[in-house]
Swiss-Prot record:
Protein's job: Epithelial ion channel that plays an important role in the regulation of epithelial ion and water transport and fluid homeostasis. Mediates the transport of chloride ions across the cell membrane. The ion channel is also permeable to HCO(3)(-); selectivity depends on the extracellular chloride concentration. Exerts its function also by modulating the activity of other ion channels and transporters. Contributes to the regulation of the pH and the ion content of the epithelial fluid layer.
Residues carrying a glycan: N895, N901, N902, N911
The name this protein goes by in its record: Cystic fibrosis transmembrane conductance regulator
Modification type Phosphoserine: residues: S549, S660, S670, S686, S700, S712, S737, S768, S791, S796, S814, S1447, S1459
Residue span, ABC transporter domain: 423-646, 1213-1446
Annotated Pfam families: ABC_membrane, ABC_tran, CFTR_R
Length: 1483
């Protein structure tokens, strides 16, 4: 960044903002980069401002029982705030003085008052000087207030962030992500530009008092008629505002329904294409859009009437003020024109400035109170440690995550009793709700010496993670004591990657030691992964390390924990995402060897780990089930240990399944020991539905950090179901639009209307910060740990408000170590962290965009022509009247003037009455122009219709775009087009265009009238208009680029907050809060640099506009004074209209800039509409299907299938030289893949994580850029359409897709099948019992990714879709990744039965599933290494041979059948596993 010219600028340069000229010149000539932006002044740095406010807030906290944040702000900013307020008041006072001078000028032209004619020129100079003074006062004052507002926002931003890092975990569990983002976005944004309006709350009453005093002198009591009318207009506008809010509230729900489906479609676009659901999704979204647009139109009409009210009130306020006085006493023109000028100022003050000021104070004080409450919340308390302690001791430790649960339990129980469930089962309730008031940990005791390994195991939700949190001090014990040195290192269960290099993530601010670093890299098996990157360990990782696989992220997190030199290492299930071989190697080399002399506590469920641990602690339901050595476990609990070791290959199971088995075993033995509750009662599954369909689930922050901790405390009830606290009065649409640009995009979306109160929702809590920290969003498809293939899409849900697509950090802050923080920003590194495409659209909206927008809807052209015709007609009529009255005979001046002055006439008569009538007509014409009912409503209506067409075209384009194009985009960027940009097209653009057209036509009309009255003025008008157009074009190039850079700079602030929250436990464990506060301040300073420069250039432009007009007004004043003879009416009309033109023309120019800015949304939409389509025309003609385009049967005109017209008939696949890429210009992910599959054969895909197994399945569906050929039953994929090709496959994807809709819609979106057929399939896959327990059965509405269903049930839904599709080839991509044994057996059985004659291609990590395959395709380094039977693979040295255990190997040879039978009997022992485990095993 460059040093700012402001530092060396002179007073004159600062006053006129001339120091911004270099950036304006550069922005006009070329595209601005971040390197062109000026550094911020030191007074605006986040460090200084936050320190200043923090000091005052601490003083406030120390001195008072009820501290007030506004007092701290007052002490920091009050005097500057008042100084600029006084300048603003003086500038506004000049507006009240100007009409007095205007009146004197008009009076000097009275034929009977020739004495004053000589001073008219001096009065004109005085009037012009007032304009100059006003310009010099108002602009610095407005800029100064904007600047103070910016400083207040920065200081409070920093204060909130620092407080967030200090909050206790209990508090974080009660705060939603939406609330935090709301504090930092909607609430604080009110200070930036709103502060300039705040002073009008006292300026307007003083101004109105002054104006009414001056009007009283002119019109006496009748002046109050005009004021009364303006007050009525203000109340009328307030009523319209309330009506508009009512429509917006209704519409907000409809918009959110549409955005839910749209976001689900975007996030799961690969599944939508795989299922061929493009038409169904398009129809579903368009239907919702239609309903939404009905309410949009109503709201737009109300807003139109509100906008028109301001325009037409101008004429009536003058009319009502003047008419009573004129009828009673008569009136002269001087009073009329003076009154008109006063009323213009009065109208703006009463109907605009004062309501805006009141709203600003209301919003600002509300925001300050919210921030004040937040800043007083309970903080995290650091435990007192003894640094000389070498042992870790816990004595009788008991802890609760949440307090006051007893009352909540009673209330929820009462609610349940009062609510009747439709199936009549009133006992359906939380089966584990009795645990609600129980501690998460109870009477825990253990002691480990230095260098020992304690293995912690236990059932799901037993409190394993909570135990580590209590040791770290995150969870405060309510009883007992903990003793250790306090030098802790921590590895979270869900890996957290901060933006930066791999090296920075591992070192994490600790001093760099080359030998230690290399040892850790080697022990964590990262050497091979790092060697694959061109920049090795200096590669910059973006958003959450999304370009890495889950295993790579897990190993980097582990390496970070191991690299730190600590006394105690807390490892929370660090191996969950590693394959069996890698896990074994890391455990041996890292945990057992490298850390041999360190004290370690490892959360694990592996028998191998338990055997090697010095001590074992097994937890169950928060209590100690066993503590001792492994040999003691075998002696004291022989039944338990033998049960676990009785499972074949227990350690080979996935971590989820091991936890499931462990949970079931512990519960079985604890129940047998206690004999308390019957097992069947415990496994009852249930749910309940809220009374109000719109009630939504609580989305608190602690959940986001730790939904995966799966506490035995259960889902909250309807008391806390919203994204904001239950008692929040914030409007619905406001809370639903505040979302971070992160992977946890669900806060943008409305929550479900269904609350599951049974075990199926165990572990799925609100979207809280605690959930965020453990990386579980709770919504399938939005989890953090994505596989390598999926991660390349870089898709995460983004905000709909104020978010552009930029990754968290504006730069890599340290090149070598996280210890040092550079002061200079490296722009190259900044570009690397830009995760989304920077908008590649021109700085100024092109004429082509305007032309496309106008022609998108034919009626729009006719409406614009109609507007022009009406305007020309109005101007023509006004000119005719003007010419007629110009030629009308004049009356005798003497008697009439005397009579007028003596007020003997009760009517409006003067010698220049013709001019007065002309002005009355001009006022009426302007009013008609402003009211514009004949053109305004059709214009607004047509522009909304254009928005409808654009949305339809964009939706169709996105659904038909190839994945290679979508892979280059970010889901947040796509969703922003459908949310933010469509909202602009619906709401802002129509009214802004209407205002712009209104203002331009008013200015043109006024200029024509003035020019006709005084032709010389037209000569002055032409250069002024040219100057305006040139100045606008000059400024627009730079301002739009600065605004874009400012928008891009805003996203890192919010993303940094979310990133910090995800890793909050890690930050605290490593003591890196100051480092991350510095990073946050850097992100704030980057945004401030852009915003401050934008504010400065905007003020430069506004000031130049006013200066040009002041010159124009000086010219008009002297032309009219010097060229007008005896005609006070002509001078009055010219000067009054000229003064009116000034404000209107400035407004019009600003509106034109707003239109250009909003049209960028249209440009972005057109960019999406112009995306390529993926449809590939078949090389051979295709005969249409007999049953229509949605038929389950494809009839292909092909020589291979003429005898049997049903295709595919057998499922034979031949793959020849298949090469696949994610994007056309990218590297090949798969190269020259060739093999063939016989009909009905089962083929397993083998290979390491990231080898391309999932990619191959995507290539079969033509979801990637592919070369080569695939044939199914002799039909080449080039000879048929994409839809026909994809319908040949049944798909069970790794990422389960359940969209918001009924069960029926989810199973059969095209409505091809009747209920009988759907129920038959539901029976086959074991879904009937699940569906029947919901009210409405097939018509029950699933929302929020089907969160009421377990992951296993969702997989069964996918299976049912495949059965209904009648596909002959089934593709399964790790279908059992998160399944419990019961659901897994159902899926295996169904596949065997329903797809007995089908070809099955399976990508799976479970050994027992792979054993059923006849052949295996081994993929290594993007190529096929082997394609053989499993027996042949085992006879050779291969990766598969190393991974498979001896017991599994036995199943493949002569005794295979009996072995299989034995295996089944063991799995059958789990038949009593409850649905709770099914839910708990999912991520």
């Amino acid at each position: 960044m460059q040093r700012s010219p402001l530092e060396k600028a002179s007073v004159i340069s600062k006053l006129f903002f001339s120091w911004t000229r270099p950036i304006l010149r550069k922005g006009y000539r070329q595209r601005l980069e971040l390197s062109d932006i000026y550094q911020i002044p030191s007074t605006d740095s986040a460090d200084n401002l936050s320190e200043k406010l923090e000091r005052e807030w601490d003083r406030e906290l120390a001195s008072k029982k009820n501290p007030k944040l506004i007092n701290a702000l007052r002490r920091c900013f009050f005097w500057k705030f008042m100084f600029y307020g006084i300048l603003l008041y003086l500038g506004e006072v000049t507006k009240a003085v100007q009409p007095l001078l205007l009146g004197r000028i008009i009076a000097s032209y009275d034929p009977d008052n020739k004495v004053e004619r000589s001073i008219a020129i001096y009065l004109g100079i005085g009037l012009c000087l007032l304009f100059v003074v006003r310009t010099l006062l108002l602009h610095p004052a407005i800029f100064g207030l904007h600047h103070i507002g910016m400083q207040m926002r920065i200081a409070m931003f920093s204060l909130i962030y620092k407080k967030t890092l200090k909050l206790s975990s209990r508090v974080l569990d009660k705060i939603s992500i939406g609330q935090l983002i709301s504090l930092l976005s909607n609430n604080l944004n009110k200070f930036d530009e709103g502060l300039a309006l705040a002073h009008f709350v006292w300026i307007v009453p003083l101004q109105v008092t002054l104006l009414m005093g001056l009007l009283w002198e002119l019109l006496q009591a009748s002046a109050f008629c005009g004021l009364a009318f303006l007050i009525i207009v203000a109340f009328y506008q307030a009523g319209l505002g309330r009506m508009m809010m009512k429509y917006r509230d209704k519409r907000g729900g409809k918009i959110n329904e549409r955005l839910v489906i749209t976001s689900e479609m975007i996030e799961n676009i690969q599944s939508v294409k795989a299922y061929c659901w493009e038409e169904a999704m398009e129809k579903m979204i368009e239907n919702l859009r239609q309903t939404e647009l009905k309410l949009t139109r109503k709201a737009a009409y109300v807003r139109y009437c509100n906008s028109s009210a301001f325009f037409f009130s101008g004429f009536f306020v003058v009319f009502l003020s003047v008419l009573p006085y004129a009828l009673m006493k008569g009136i002269i023109l001087r009073k009329i024109f003076t009154t008109i000028s006063f009323c213009i100022v009065l109208r703006m003050a009463v109907t605009r400035q004062f309501p805006w000021a009141v709203q600003t104070w209301y919003d600002s004080l509300g925001a300050i109170n919210k921030i004040q409450d937040f800043l007083q919340k309970q903080e995290y308390k650091t435990l007192e440690y003894n640094l000389t302690t070498t042992e870790v001791v816990m004595e009788n430790a008991t802890a609760y995550w949440e307090e006051g649960f007893g009352g909540l339990f009673e209330k929820a129980k009462q609610n349940n009793n009062n609510r009747k469930i439709s199936n009549g089962d009133n006992s359906l309730f939380f089966s584990n709700f009795s645990l609600l008031g129980t501690p998460v940990l109870k009477d825990i005791n253990f002691k480990i010496e230095r260098g020992q390994l304690l293995a912690v195991a236990g059932s799901t939700g037993a409190g394993k993670t909570s135990l580590l949190m209590m040791i770290m001090g995150e969870l405060e014990p309510s009883a007992g004591k903990i003793k250790h040195s306090g030098r802790i290192s921590f590895c979270s269960q869900f890996s957290w990657i901060m933006p930066g290099t791999i090296k920075e993530n591992i070192i994490f601010g600790v001093s760099y030691d080359e030998y230690r670093y290399r040892s850790v890299i080697k022990a964590c098996q990262l050497e091979e992964d790092i060697s694959k990157f061109t920049e090795k360990d200096n590669i910059v990782l973006g958003e959450g390390g999304i370009t890495l696989s889950g295993g790579q992220r897990a190993r980097i997190s582990l390496a970070r924990a191991v690299y730190k030199d600590a006394d105690l290492y807390l490892l929370d299930s660090p191996f969950g995402y590693l394959d069996v071989l890698t896990e074994k190697e890391i455990f041996e080399s890292c945990v057992c060897k490298l850390m041999a002399n360190k004290t370690r506590i490892l959360v694990t469920s592996k028998m191998e780990h338990l055997k090697k641990a010095d001590k074992i602690l097994i937890l169950h339901e928060g209590s100690t089930y066993f503590y001792g050595t492994f040999s003691e476990l075998q002696n004291l609990r022989p039944d338990f240990s033998s049960k676990l070791m009785g499972y074949d290959s227990f350690d080979q199971f996935s971590a989820e399944r091991r936890n499931s088995i462990l949970t079931e075993t512990l519960r079985r033995f604890s129940l047998e020991g206690d004999g308390a509750v019957s097992w069947n009662e415990t496994r009852k599954q249930s749910f309940k539905q809220t009374g109000e369909f719109g009630e939504k689930r609580k989305n608190s922050i602690l959940n986001s950090m730790n939904s995966a901790r799966k506490f035995s405390i259960v889902q909250k009830t309807t008391l806390q179901m919203n994204g904001i606290e239950a008692n929040s009065e914030e409007p619905l649409e406001r809370r639903l639009s505040l979302v971070p640009d992160s992977e946890l995009g669900e806060t943008i979306l409305p929550r479900s209307n269904v609350i599951n109160t049974g075990p199926t929702l165990q572990g799925r809590r609100r979207q809280s910060v605690l959930n965020l920290m453990t990386g579980s969003s709770g919504n399938q498809g939005q989890g953090i740990h994505r596989k390598a293939a999926a991660s390349t899409r870089k898709m995460s849900l983004a905000p709909s408000t104020n978010f552009t697509e930029m990754d968290i950090y504006s730069r890599r802050l340290s090149q070598d170590s996280g210890l040092e923080i550079s002061e200079e920003i490296n722009e190259e590194d900044l570009k690397e962290c830009f995760f989304d495409d920077v908008e590649n659209i021109p700085a100024v909206t092109t004429w082509n965009t305007y032309l496309r927008y106008i022609t998108i809807h034919k009626s729009l052209i006719f409406v614009l022509i109609w507007c022009l015709i009406i305007f020309l007609a109005e101007v023509a009529v006004s000119l005719v009247f003007l010419l007629l009255f110009e030629k009308s005979p004049r009356q005798d001046t003497g008697n009439v003037t005397k009579s007028s002055n003596n007020s003997s006439y009760g009517v409006i008569i003067t010698n220049t009455s013709s001019y007065y009538i002309i002005y009355i007509y001009v006022g009426v014409a302007d009013t008609l122009l402003a009211l514009g009912l004949l053109r305004g409503l059709p214009l607004v209506h047509t522009l909304i219709t254009a928005s409808k067409i654009l949305h339809h075209k964009m939706l169709h384009s996105v659904l038909q775009a190839p994945m290679s194009t979508l892979n280059t985009l970010k889901a947040g960027g796509i969703l922003n087009r459908f949310s933010k940009d469509i909202a602009i097209l619906d709401d802002l653009l129509p009214l802004t265009i209407f205002d712009f057209i209104q203002l331009i036509l008013i200015v043109i009309g006024a200029v024509i009238v003035v020019s006709v009255l005084e032709p010389y003025i037209f000569l002055a008008t032409v250069p002024v208009i040219i100057a305006f157009v040139m100045l606008r074009a000059y400024f627009l190039h730079t301002s739009q680029q600065l605004k874009q850079l400012e928008s891009e700079g805003r996203s890192p602030i919010f993303t940094h907050l979310v990133t910090s929250l995800k890793g909050l436990w890690t930050l605290r464990a490593f003591g890196r809060q100051p480092y991350f506060e510095t990073l946050f301040h850097k992100a704030l300073n980057l945004h401030t640099a852009n915003w401050f420069l934008y504010l400065s250039t905007l003020r430069w432009f506004q000031m130049r506009i006013e200066m040009i007009f002041v010159i124009f007004f000086i010219a008009v004043t002297f032309i009219s004074i010097l060229t007008t003879g005896d005609g006070e009416g002509r001078v009055g009309i010219i000067l009054t209209l000229a003064m009116n033109i000034m404000n209107t023309l400035q407004w019009a120019v600003n509106s034109s800039i707003d239109v250009d800015s909003l049209m960028r949304s249209v440009s972005r939409v057109f960019k999406f509409i112009d995306m390529p389509t993926e449809e590939i025309k078949p090389s051979k003609p295709v005969k249409p299907s007999k049953e229509g385009p949605l038929s389950k049967v494809m009839i292909i005109e092909n020589e291979h299938v003429k005898k049997d017209d049903i295709w595919p008939s057998g499922g034979q696949m031949t793959v020849k030289d298949l090469t696949a890429k994610y994007i056309e210009s990218g590297n090949a992910i798969l190269e020259n893949i060739s093999f063939s599959i016989s009909p009905g054969q089962r083929v397993g895909l083998l290979g390491r994580t990231g080898s391309g197994k999932s990619t191959l399945l995507s290539a079969f569906l033509r979801l990637l850029n592919t070369e080569g050929e695939i044939q199914i039953d002799g039909v080449s994929w080039d000879s048929i359409t994409l839809q026909q090709w994809r319908k040949a496959f049944g798909v069970i994807p790794q990422k389960v897709f359940i969209f918001s809709g009924t069960f029926r819609k989810n199973l059969d979106p095209y409505e091809q099948w009747n209920d009988q057929e759907i129920w038959k399939v539901a029976d086959e896959v074991g879904l009937r019992s699940v569906i029947e327990q919901f009210p409405g059965k097939l018509d029950f509405v699933l929302v929020d990714g089907g969160y009421v269903l377990s992951h296993g049930h969702k997989q069964l839904m996918c299976l049912a879709r495949s059965v209904l599709s009648k596909a002959k080839i089934l593709l399964l991509d790790e279908p059992s990744a998160h399944l419990d044994p019961i659901t897994y057996q159902i899926i295996r059985r169904t596949i065997k039965q329903a797809f007995a004659d089908c070809t099955v291609i399976l990508c799976e990590h479970r050994i027992e599933a792979m054993l059923e395959c006849q052949r295996f395709l081994v993929i290594e380094e993007n190529k096929v290494r082997q394609y053989d039977s499993i027996q042949k693979l085992l006879s050779e040295k291969s990766l598969f041979r190393q991974a498979i255990s001896n017991s599994d190997r036995l199943k493949l040879f002569p005794h295979r059948n009996s072995s299989k039978h034995k295996s089944r009997s063991k799995i059958a022992a789990l038949k009593e596993e409850t649905e709770e485990e099914v839910q708990e095993t999912r991520l």
